[in-house]
């Protein structure tokens, strides 16, 4: 069968369905003219980045200044693999500032490294942080630490004037994880139990006294008698000056993503939480309500911004699996509710965690990290010489977010520097292509074992496979061919024909002989012959064909 015949099949209705769903993408140089035509079939010119936005191994881009905070254990190992395999081949990372926040290094420097990292973050404004360990008493002994180390997060939130911790669901086209559409969450970054002072006390009287800074007379906020022999007293407060910027960030993000916003408190019991809701509602009514109405985004919630009691929010998170909503809450409620979102959406590995603060000049400071920990169990397996299979998706989303924010800040600070503007465009093209390469690897059944089962790739093999696919996609951009855009069978097709996607995936694996996630011309031909779908030559065409 000729290359031209293949093109005719691809442009038929059935052919388009096969090509789109399976991502058939020619890889043989033997049919180069057809390869270009088939590649163009998958996208319009608008899908292809401009030439100046492309980069390659031979044309490294100087990455903009960024703070890179190293952590511990398996996630540190995985991030090292990712940076070496996916970033260093394409970027000069010499402008990044590195800080090692491992327990041992924090202990050796008496936590000066943490203070230095916070200072650098204030200055640069774009930070990536690997998961770190806040050592328990047992870990302190195991690591041989001199000092008791607290969580670095409090110092970071204070030093970067933290406003909110944005936690959003991560989605892979074609793979249903939990929520079908995005779910956004804004967690107030300061206040509450996380900054509390406390002490163990016995019987007595506890006074909480407020001393105004303007010289007014102090007064007692709370007085209580402690009659138990053993008590723990806790004091904390909730700063509300930054709730207004939190509201603007939240509502604008929901508006941009076309999702419906909700505000969560327990103000019916905790009367002091009324102020949070009041500020959010005022900002919404004055600046955003009409814009949400224009988009029809309030129809699902009675035509206005809705308040949810935190107890009710826990139930709705389980029920609203179609997604398409956002929530904003206090620090502690936000922590608990986003853990629940992670469970509905498969795992914390599919949730982002971005701290947003504000620099003195008004620009946003953004710190990006995965919402999971250091994955100690896999680290212990790795140290024991066992195979591991860590899904780095959350880590990579954080690196991508930090890299993009760094590029935006650098271009904004240097608007007349064409090299900075060009680098920003190149970085956004690269990160988009990286996401496509990583997501397609999962979709081809070549993911880690949490996604692909026992036959899934190891940590190292997955990184290598994505690196191979990333280079392939970037190289293809120079040839005017974009990364393949995998399409889903239409919902109408699924409904009418009861599509068995597992069986289809098995069929794809059967004909993808070399397991690279592509069906080339030869494999495609073999598949059509086996299925009795190959177009046959007419008698007239057969007579003309030479017998060789």
Swiss-Prot record:
Protein name: Isocitrate dehydrogenase [NAD(+)] 1, mitochondrial
Influence of pH: Optimum pH is 8.0 with Mn(2+) as cofactor and 8.8 with Mg(2+) as cofactor.
NADP in keyword set: no
Cofactor(s) in the UniProt record: Mg(2+); Mn(2+)
Domain statement: The C-terminal EF-hand domain is required for homodimerization.
Cofactor annotation remark: Binds 1 Mg(2+) or Mn(2+) ion per subunit.
UniProt xrefs under Pfam families: EF-hand_1, Iso_dh
Gene: IDH1
Residues noted as binding Mg(2+) in the record, renumbered to the chain: 311, 335, 339
Reactions accelerated catalytically: D-threo-isocitrate + NAD(+) = 2-oxoglutarate + CO2 + NADH
SMART domains xref list: EFh, Iso_dh
Thermal characteristics: Optimum temperature is around 30 degrees Celsius with Mn(2+) as cofactor and 35 degrees Celsius with Mg(2+) as cofactor. Stable below 28 degrees Celsius, but rapidly loses activity above 30 degrees Celsius. Has 60% of maximal activity after 20-minute incubation at 35 degrees Celsius.
GO MF assignments: calcium ion binding; identical protein binding; isocitrate dehydrogenase (NAD+) activity; isocitrate dehydrogenase (NADP+) activity; magnesium ion binding; protein homodimerization activity
């Amino acid at each position: 069968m000729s290359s031209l015949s293949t093109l005719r099949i691809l442009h038929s209705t059935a052919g388009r369905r096969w090509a789109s769903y399976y991502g058939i993408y020619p890889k043989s140089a033997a049919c180069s003219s057809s390869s270009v035509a088939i590649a163009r079939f998958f996208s319009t010119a608008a899908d292809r980045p401009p030439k100046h936005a492309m980069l390659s191994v031979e044309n490294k881009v100087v990455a903009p200044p960024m703070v890179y905070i190293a952590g511990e254990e398996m996630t540190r190992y995985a991030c090292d693999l990712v940076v070496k395999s996916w970033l260093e081949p394409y970027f000069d990372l010499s402008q990044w500032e590195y800080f090692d926040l491992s327990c041992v290094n924090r202990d050796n420097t008496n936590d000066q490294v943490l203070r230095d990292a916070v200072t650098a973050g204030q200055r640069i404004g774009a930070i990536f942080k690997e998961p770190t360990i806040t050592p328990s008493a047992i870990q302190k002994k195991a690591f041989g630490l001199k000092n008791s180390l607290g969580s670095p997060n409090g110092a970071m939130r204070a030093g970067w004037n933290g406003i909110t911790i944005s936690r959003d669901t991560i989605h892979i086209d074609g793979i249903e994880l939990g929520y079908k559409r995005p779910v956004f969450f804004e967690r107030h970054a300061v206040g509450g139990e996380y900054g509390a002072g406390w002490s163990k006390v016995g019987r007595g009287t506890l006074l909480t006294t407020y001393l105004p800074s303007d010289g007014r007379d102090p007064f007692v906020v709370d007085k209580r008698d402690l009659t138990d022999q053993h008590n723990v007293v806790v004091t904390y407060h909730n700063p509300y000056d930054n709730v207004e910027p939190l509201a603007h960030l939240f509502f604008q993000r929901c508006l941009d993503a076309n999702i419906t916003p909700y505000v969560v408190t327990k103000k019916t019991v905790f009367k002091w939480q009324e102020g949070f809701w009041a500020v959010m509602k005022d900002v919404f009514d004055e600046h955003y309500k009409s814009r949400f109405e224009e988009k029809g985004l309030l129809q699902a919630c009675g035509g206005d911004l809705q308040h949810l009691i935190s107890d009710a929010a826990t139930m709705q998170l389980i029920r609203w699996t179609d997604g398409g909503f956002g929530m904003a809450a206090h620090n502690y409620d936000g922590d608990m509710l986003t853990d629940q979102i992670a469970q509905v959406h498969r795992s914390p590995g599919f949730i982002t965690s971005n701290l947003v603060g504000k620099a003195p000049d008004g620009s946003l400071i953004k710190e990006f990290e995965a919402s999971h920990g250091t994955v100690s169990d896999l680290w212990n397996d790795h140290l024991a010489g066992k195979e591991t299979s860590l899904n780095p998706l959350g880590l990579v989303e954080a690196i991508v977010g930090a890299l993009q924010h760094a590029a935006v800040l650098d271009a904004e600070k240097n608007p007349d520097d064409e090299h900075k503007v060009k680098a920003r465009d190149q970085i956004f093209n690269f990160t988009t292509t990286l996401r496509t390469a990583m997501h397609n690897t999962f979709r081809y059944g070549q993911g880690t074992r949490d996604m692909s089962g026992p036959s899934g790739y190891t940590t190292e093999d997955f990184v290598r496979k994505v690196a191979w696919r990333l280079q392939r996609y970037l190289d293809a951009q120079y040839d005017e061919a974009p990364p393949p855009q995998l399409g889903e069978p239409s919902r109408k097709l699924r409904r009418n024909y009861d599509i068995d996607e597992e069986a289809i995936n098995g069929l794809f694996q059967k004909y993808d002989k070399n397991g690279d996630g592509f069906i080339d011309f030869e494999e495609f031909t073999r598949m059509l012959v086996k299925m009795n779908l190959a177009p046959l030559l007419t008698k007239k065409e057969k007579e003309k064909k030479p017998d060789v």
